[in-house]
Amino acid sequence: MIKIDAQSVDFYYGDFHALKNISMQIEANTSVAFIGPSGCGKSTFLRLFNRMNDLIPDTRLEGKIFIDGRNIYSKGEKVDTLRKNVGMVFQKPNPFPKTIFENVAYGLRVNGIKDNEYIEETVVKSLKQ
């Protein structure tokens, strides 16, 4: 069973063409290694699977990526739900390009907490620990 299906993926940082025509299928319950020199696009490609590159200004994806048969870049796809199901663990810390406060508050907000006073208290308490 195919878990991830990347079809004719091209990715750009501004005018820089970082990924060129990548197509691959990854079976469910398998291990895959992406090996290559620094700067060749491994992390860029992996970040496409939970749309972390959406947070970087002036980027563009061409092609399609399906996870469990769903096009994760289709209109109406809920990014928060996707990120709950597709996690990333990086060798080096990789905070979202936001303030420290917003990075810590992100987990609360993505889980539906809207009470700003509660969010502020929780973030401050967490940062003091």
Language model region names:
Residues 64-71, 109-112, 116-129:
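Conserved ABC ATPase "signature" region
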Residues 35-37:
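The feature captures the beta-strand-to-loop junction immediately N-terminal to the Walker
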Residues 55-57, 93-102:
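Conserved catalytic motifs of ABC-family nucleotide-binding domains
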Residues 16-17, 80:
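Short coil-to-beta microelement around the adenine-binding A-loop and adjacent beta1/P-loop entry
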Residues 10, 64-81:
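ABC ATPase NBD Q-loop/coupling interface
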Residues 78-86, 91, 122:
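ABC transporter nucleotide-binding domains
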Residues 49-50, 100, 104-105:
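Conserved short hydrophobic alpha-helix within the nucleotide-binding domain
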